[in-house]
Swiss-Prot record:
Reaction equations catalysed: RX + glutathione = an S-substituted glutathione + a halide anion + H(+)
Biological-process GO terms, alphabetical: glutathione metabolic process
Protein name as annotated: Glutathione S-transferase theta-3
Tissue specificity note: Expressed strongly in liver, and at lower levels in kidney and testis.
InterPro entries in alphabetical order: Glutathione-S-Trfase_C-like, Glutathione-S-Trfase_C_sf, Glutathione_S-Trfase, Glutathione_S-Trfase_N, GST_C, GST_C_Theta, GST_N_Theta, GST_Theta
Pfam families xrefs: GST_C, GST_N
Gene: Gstt3
Amino acid sequence: MGLELYLDLMSQPCRAVYIFAKKNGIPFQLRTIELLKGQQYTDSFAQVNPLRKVPALKDGDFVLAESVAILLYLSRKYKAPDHWYPQDLQTRARVDEYLAWQHTALRSCCTRAMWQKMMFPVFLGQPVPPEMLASTLAELDGCLQVLEDKFLRNQAFLTGSHISVADLVAITELMHPVSAGCKIFESRPKLAAWRQRVEAEVGESLFQEAHEVVLKAKDMPPLMDPALKEKLKLSVQCLLH
């Protein structure tokens, strides 16, 4: 059995892995795990990833979890072009720096913005206090400012003049609040221009393909299965803080 990627394109790290593999011509078998249907809780998936999270990679008998680890594994194994994860010590350190920051900063507020603005009220039927959403959106705005001032600065991409895995991870995060109707690029021309450059490097068709599911999420019908609804609510209550 060749390379298998367990993904749900509703998930931002899954989209980053999907885009990277497709863009670099890496052959893989897509194994879709639909998070909103609770497929991550099945015993069969737990045998692949006991953490019950996606993305997950299976390469023969080798199994790997965590999106950053998967991206770097694919980059090394398939000898992706150097710009994705540069050999230059300091440029690579800049990529590592961004990946270390975003996991608890940008990812956290992007995920909470999307769920509080759209998924809780529309999909789970659970209203979110306006003051909570306002606080989350203010935090997101602060993270976007750090993204501009600390990482993008006056460069073409987050770590220099070429696209890297840092840009893939960042753009897929930002499309989460975009899918919920947050106009995060409208008042930030520098970030908007960066987004256009990332899309151009990835390819508009691939970018749209990877984000089709999440951009249609606002049209999903409410979840009706009461048992699954309660299970999902419990798993995402941390996003209401």
